[in-house]
UniProtKB/Swiss-Prot annotation:
Keyword DNA damage included in the entry's annotation: yes
Domain of life: Bacteria
CDD domains assigned: HATPase_MutL-MLH-PMS-like, MutL_Trans
SUPFAM superfamilies: ATPase domain of HSP90 chaperone/DNA topoisomerase II/histidine kinase (SSF55874), DNA mismatch repair protein MutL (SSF118116), Ribosomal protein S5 domain 2-like (SSF54211)
Protein source organism: Staphylococcus aureus (strain MSSA476)
Chain's role: This protein is involved in the repair of mismatches in DNA. It is required for dam-dependent methyl-directed DNA mismatch repair. May act as a 'molecular matchmaker', a protein that promotes the formation of a stable complex between two or more DNA-binding proteins in an ATP-dependent manner without itself being part of a final effector complex.
Protein name: DNA mismatch repair protein MutL
GO BP of this protein: mismatch repair
Keyword Iron: no
A GO molecular-function descriptor: ATP hydrolysis activity
Listed Polar residues bias regions: 361-377
Database matches in Gene3D superfamilies: 3.30.230.10, Histidine kinase-like ATPase, C-terminal domain (3.30.565.10), MutL, C-terminal domain, dimerisation subdomain (3.30.1540.20), MutL, C-terminal domain, regulatory subdomain (3.30.1370.100)
Amino acid sequence: MGKIKELQTSLANKIAAGEVVERPSSVVKELLENAIDAGATEISIEVEESGVQSIRVVDNGSGIEAEDLGLVFHRHATSKLDQDEDLFHIRTLGFRGEALASISSVAKVTLKTCTDNANGNEIYVENGEILNHKPAKAKKGTDILVESLFYNTPARLKYIKSLYTELGKITDIVNRMAMSHPDIRIALISDGKTMLSTNGSGRTNEVMAEIYGMKVARDLVHISGDTSDYHIEGFVAKPEHSRSNKHYISIFINGRYIKNFMLNKAILEGYHTLLTIGRFPICYINIEMDPILVDVNVHPTKLEVRLSKEEQLYQLIVSKIQEAFKDRILIPKNNLDYVPKKNKVLHSFEQQKIEFEQRQNTENNQEKTFSSEESNSKPFMVENQNDEIVIREDSYNPFVTKTSESLIADDESSGYNNTREKDEDYFKKQQEILQEMDQTFDSNDDTSVQNYENKASDDYYDVNDIKGTKSKDPKRRIPYMEIVGQVHGTYIIAQNEFGMYMIDQHAAQERIKYEYFRDKIGEVTNEVQDLLIPLTFHFSKDEQLVIDQYKNELQQVGIMLEHFGGHDYIVSSYPVWFPKDEVEEIIKDMIELILEEKKVDIKKLREDVAIMMSCKKSIKANHYLQKHEMSDLIDQLREAEDPFTCPHGRPIIINFSKYELEKLFKRVM
């Protein structure tokens, strides 16, 4: 007798549910996607005990026809696909017809639904079987209640994290959906407390203000761009709002949230040296494309996708982010409102580096599974100044459009103190900003975008009434200022009518020299300096194999390495722009970079060499300068392409506005 047999439907559904329904947030995601696909304009999500006890999703979408109710909980029963070709033209968020069947096999489900001009219906499903089907009073749309999740698969409950973690994952999903569908009013309520309530205005920047707070929202920069195959639209936050993990990066394709390593890399390359090591930006990017260019049928959660013409999209994202910050004033304003806790001791640089590397290793191990506890629990919780997560607890009031006052009041992470929030002029200005935001990003008109940023950035940076915006004269991105002196032989102090400035002299010269060396390394030049006595380098056999493979790449950065017999190589000339006293050291460092990587990306090699040379040749800390030397340094910095951060992403200049200084000394209350 044969051993192979077909599994019972209930058992097969439980197995399938393990792929689709991983945790409570998976249920929320699937039901929310169904509501959006049904054309809903209002969606309410209510959870109890972080969704373990119950999840209820109510929408005003099209509803389910009475004759379809018998099929709705069957596996692979869907209205979104009809034939094979449809799989390559998917525009809906769901399409497999697996979600409801999987959910009902591991939970108790009650569904009420009603379509236009029809009577409502209610069905109750347990263990995948419809136990009750009756007429019921219902509004147009669908009301689905999921209770006792994993009641019949207790082993799954053991792997549920803390309720706080599960709520964080639910919040993450709902917030991302709200960003990608700003035209839908979405409310998330946990145990009777409102976690999120959007107004459905259609403006993504307003949703981001609700999620991240007004301080971040005011510093969002709009990006938009096209190729023959792609259109991208989104917002990128200024570098000062960077975070310690990459989960604040939100990428959508045709409204679907996705994770993609190459697109993440494109965003980071767009920011380039504006971010320090271990810091990641806040950004939202939606990519519109023909569905035939993307395969979303790769992973059960539909988070992973495969893209055609990925390199073209990569370059588009990089160029648009770079354009967004080009010629823009990015001097971060000092935050005097934050006072560290008394028992909080700053770690040494070495300790911070160790912690960062440990965190990176952990994140890299978890990235493929998308199940990192950090990944979904942290992103869209509001952070306070200590990078601690704070869950806002508003009273339950779904679908209520928040006024500008309430948006400001909710911004617990903004860093403004109570004294200033009581100032009537300040509130008036914030109201004007929000009203301006309401009218700004409806078009791609650069003038309207710049006008908004001119007004919104008044509190961000005070200089020449062009705060945080593009400067017509690039040399005026660094304001003219009077040199006052120097602190600890490291920081230059300057002032003008708008306040005080601190300039890191090492970082400033590092930026200047980096741009010089970067351009020189990229030049093809015949101007070389011959050596009377060639430099000799000795390498092991395995090192020789690598060097011989990449001799041409070394020539592209000016190093003519010749085999001299045995394990020896010589260099008899070098580019004239090499510092004479460091020729041997620079060549050694270049070769070591190649030996370390065991491969060569010529662009990265030039970048690494330029950073290395600029760091070594720059003024160090505890080096005292004369006033004219400080002035010359700032004048040179003013000529730089990106004068606000060093090549490692650290800030070069910080502004203390006159108001902030007066507040520090209690001259204003």
